[in-house]
Structure formats: C-alpha cells, structure tokens
Amino acid sequence: MCYNVDNMDFDKEKRNQLIRVVIVDVISFFAVIFMVFVLVAVVKGWRLNRKLEFEQYGMVQAESLPTGAKVVADGREIAETNISKLLSAGEHEIVLKKDGYDTWSKKISITAGKLLRLKYPRLFKQSRETEVLATEKDLSFFETATNHRAILYGLKESPKFKYVTNLEGDTTTSEFDVTNYTSFVSNGKFTGRLKKIIWNENSEKAVVNLVSGEVSEWLLLNFKEAAKSVNLTKVISGYTDKDIEKIVQEKRLEAKEAEAFTKAEKAKNGYVISEVQISDGQATRLMVLIDGKIREVNLNEKIIYETIVTDVAKFSMYGSELAFVKKLNADKKFVISIFKLRDTGEIKIDEVDESVGLNQIFVNLTEFYGEKYLNTVIGQNLRVYNTDDYPNHDSENTNLNLALEKTLEVSPSEFYTSANGEFFMGVSGNKVMLVNLELMELLQFEHNNNTIRQLDYYLMFDVVDGKMQVYDFDHDNQRTILEKVADGFDAVINHNNRYLYYVGTSDNGLQIKRDKLF
C-alpha cells in the first residue's frame, strides 16, 4: 500500500488552519461581546472605584450664566461650566463660583445610572452698571413679554401705554394710545385697569383684559400696526357666526329670510367674552369662551367658527389641545375634560360635586421633552397625568397615566403653566406650590409677601422692604440683589441674558431701570 505524503501533510495543514480560524472567530466573538458589555456598562455609569470595586455612578450636567464658573463638588474643584461629570450615587454639595460674582450652591441627590441637569444656576455680578431708561411720576402697571423681548407699561390715568423693545441693546420706546379701542377713556383719562395680558409669540401683539368696575373689555393690541388693533368685546357680535350660518343652511332659508333670521339669532346671543387664548403664533386666530362656549375666532376673516364645546366655565389651551371645566347644572356637578382639535368629541377626566366652588378647580396643559402633561387641581387635591399623545374620543382606552397625586397644604387662588412649560405653579397668599415635571415632584414653600413673579424661566423674585430677593424655582439660593425697588411691578432678565429690567424708586418718582449682568 502506498501513501502520498504530500497529500497527507496538506490535509493536516488545512485542518490546522481551519481550527485556527475557528479559534480566532470564537475569540473575536467573545471579545466583541465583552467590549459591548464594557461599553454598555460605561455608558450606564459603571466604574471601578478607589476600593477596586465596581460601582454605578450617576451624571450631573452643570451649566451657568455666565459660563466659566468653577464647579466645586464636595469641596473639590472639578471643572468649569458648562460640564458633565460622573458622581457616585448619594448626596453631594455643588458650589458654583466666579470672580466678581456671587456664589450659587445646592445639595443634590445623584441616582445611579441617572442624569441630573442643573441648567438654571445664575450668578449675579456684584458690581453692576445701572442705567435709568425713564423717570415716571406714577405707574399703573409694568408687564414683561413671555419671550422676554418687550415691556408694556402705563402711567396712571393715561391712555397712552408705553411699549419698549430692543431690550438686548439700545431700547426703543413707542406710545400706544388705546383711546380709540376702549370705552374706558373719558376726558382724556384712562379710567380702567389692566387685569390680564397674553402675549403672542414674537411679542408684537397682545390680548389684554381691561376692567372698570364691573365692566370688562377684551382687546387685541397690535403694537407694530396700531390700526389693526381691535376691541373684541365690541366687534365680536358683528362677525360671521358659523353656528347661525349652519342653521340657515339646514333650514334652506332664502336670502331675506336668512338675513332676518341671522339678525334675530344674534340679538338673542350675548356674545359675552369671559376668556381668550391665542391659538396661532401671529394672533390672527383666538380661542374664545363666548357665552359658555369655546369657539375659535378668525380675526382676518372676521369669522366665529362653530362651537367646539358648550357649558364651559373655564378652559386652558396648549398646542392643539384644550382642557376645560364644564358646569352641568342639571346634574349639580362640574366635569373636567380634554379635547383634541379636529377630534370628534371630548374625553372626560374627572367629575366634581358643585359644592366645590369653581374658583377651587384648575386645569392646565403643557408639553415637556416630547411628553404631554395635564394638571388638575380640585380644592387641595393635585394630579398630574402624562402621555405621549392624548387618546382620540372613540379610542377603546381613554385613560391617562396618573404620574403624580398629592395633597396641597392649602387651596390655591391661582394655578397655571409656567412660561417655559416646565412647571405647573400655584399661589395662595404667600404660599407657593410648584410641580417640577423633570423630577415629577411637588414643592411647597412660603415667602415674605403675596407678590411672587418669575425673573427668568427658572428664577423667581419678590420685593421685600424695597429690596429685590431672588431664588431658584425650588426656593434655594435666596439672595438680595437690588435695593430701592418698587413693589407690585414685574421685572425681567431679557432674552439674551444681558440686562435685568425693573422699576426702581427715587426722590423724583419711579424709574425704569436696567442693570448690565455681564
């Protein structure tokens, strides 16, 4: 028998090569698995601590205004803002400091594998440049725009409101005379007062509610084109009413009959406006509560669209959703519901006995990080619901996820959504209630008096004994930053964070001032 030695060696080498390939593939496979495992662990915050033990850390993101503040964690300087830093789970003290500025500090709780954002710290320059923009004998109101780009203020008994823009640089002040748009001007004197103001997105328009005694008027003020301003209370009854038009079409009335019928129906309606929300960025469309009905009004086309919901006592709006309280007299109860525009009907959230007064019921909407939130307050009971999207009226399951339920220390007199949509906030005298949606927690605290406002989206202020006290939304970092400040007026840090606008006191009267922050 003969063997081919060359063939045997070749087969053996081929088998060995195949074995090597398999071994390499197996090692590579497990190496990839191991690397993925390590990377996932790193991303989730796992580290080897000083005791050579694996420990899952959490992350804190610290920002500040101005940037470049030194970050001290538990007495050790770790970096400058803006930074992201891993910290062990548990309690830590964070201090931010910068030369020439005051200090900010907070005790934080780090959760393993979680991110904590500190995006709101603000340091105030200790020596600031102050500029007097105007000196006025007396002010009736001083209101700042939601986007922090404009100011509207008025002098007592003067129908000429002052509109201030370009807050980031050389300010521009123009007069807006309301004489032609309200009946609350007599012999050249404004006899009403500003009760409420709702700004549009670019702060070039605002819906204002003026009152005089028991009489109320709703106006749309166009600050750039005054001639396009309108007294909604006076003109709304003259708009095309789609509810009446629909009945005319159903009855198939002839032109003269339709005209007479429309006139008679309009005479029956009071067209009483009790609430207004701006439903588009340019304020050409408004969502209005008219005679207890929520209806959209097109100002350009002068149309009142068909009724969306009836028997409404109060409502709020965010995006394309409405939340409202209905008063059902026959059933002696209130019903809290939501409605998605262009849906076929409303979704009931809760029922409330009429023994609970309407002034103790609040509904608010917002959207935060892509998630939608509904807040209800009934007396001292607070609830927050969340969802990716509200269900449709005909959905099989219309229940919402109850994210938070708490009992408030007192019944609030006001409850609303903050300007940036990140908080639900309420007040009752000097008590403040705030729901932080990011952490889904309720904060309740007291301050020195009843006038508490927001200075920016995260900073609140109060005026006590002529001094402006500021504090974070959670009531930490209370500091006195100004003296000789007039109480009862708004104040604001403008949109690019360069200036602080406020009303100061002087021997010559009240002064519109601004401080340069950095």
Residue ranges, per PLM feature:
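Repeated scaffold domains used in trafficking and secretory/extracellular systems
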Residues: A134-E143, V185-I198, Y239-R252, A258-I278, ...
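Short, ordered coil/turn segments that flank beta-strands lining enzyme active or ligand-binding pockets
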Residues: A73, D99, E201, L299-N300, ...
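Short beta-strand elements that form the blades of beta-propeller/WD-repeat-like
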Residues: F141-V164, I198-V211, L219, K246, ...
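A general secondary-structure boundary signal
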Residues: P66-A69, A73-G75, L220-N222, E296-N298, ...
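Short N-terminal helix-initiation segments at or just after the protein's N-terminus
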Residues: M8-K12, F37-V43, I361-F362, L402-V410, ...
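Surface-exposed loop/turn elements that mediate protein-protein interactions on large endomembrane-trafficking
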Residues: R128-A134, K160-N187, V211-N269, L289-I308, ...
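Generic "edge-of-domain/loop-turn" microfeature
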Residues: T67-A69, I78, H92, Y101-T103, ...
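Short loop/turn and low-complexity linker motifs enriched in small/turn-promoting residues
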Residues: Y3-F161, I197, A264-G270, V276, ...
